[in-house]
Design a protein with these regions (language model features):
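Accessory DNA-engaging acidic/polar modules
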Residues: 1-135
């Protein structure tokens, strides 16, 4: 008798695109150099993120990511993705997983790259930011 088998649907990695003003941005490390090179024109090496000024360019990137096995979310309302830390707190790990970052008088404010990064930041002592959007 043959053992029962079933197809396991491989879980696709999801990338969150954020609308920041006129830009759409996301942060993701790609093992696939071919995919990274295809998106290289949109990579901001100073901020370690991909930026799209035009909807057409963003949509082309979305198609490329889908073909490469990624899902995506488009986020315009940043609520729930922004965390804050006191100015004196260690923040390197949180910064690493953020898409954008601002310093205020007594705190550092981060837009995290996805909800998993938000949860990790909360575990490291950050709190959800409830103020007006700074990004």
């Amino acid at each position: 008798m043959q053992a029962n088998t079933f197809d396991v649907i491989e879980r696709r990695k999801c990338i969150t695109f954020f609308k920041l003003g006129k830009l759409w941005v996301f942060k993701q490390f790609f093992d696939n150099h071919e995919l990274f090179n295809a998106l290289l024109d949109y990579y901001n090496k100073d901020l370690y993120r991909f930026e799209f000024k035009y909807i057409g360019a963003r949509n082309n990137a979305l198609k490329l990511l889908e073909k490469s096995g990624f899902d995506y979310d488009l986020v315009e309302d940043l609520k729930g993705y922004v965390v804050q830390l006191p100015k004196h707190a260690k923040y390197a790990q949180i910064l690493k997983n953020s898409v954008a970052f601002k310093e205020a008088a007594n705190e550092r404010i981060f837009l995290m790259k996805d909800l998993a990064a938000v949860e990790e930041a909360l575990g490291l002592g950050a709190k959800i930011y409830e103020g007006a959007s700074l990004f």
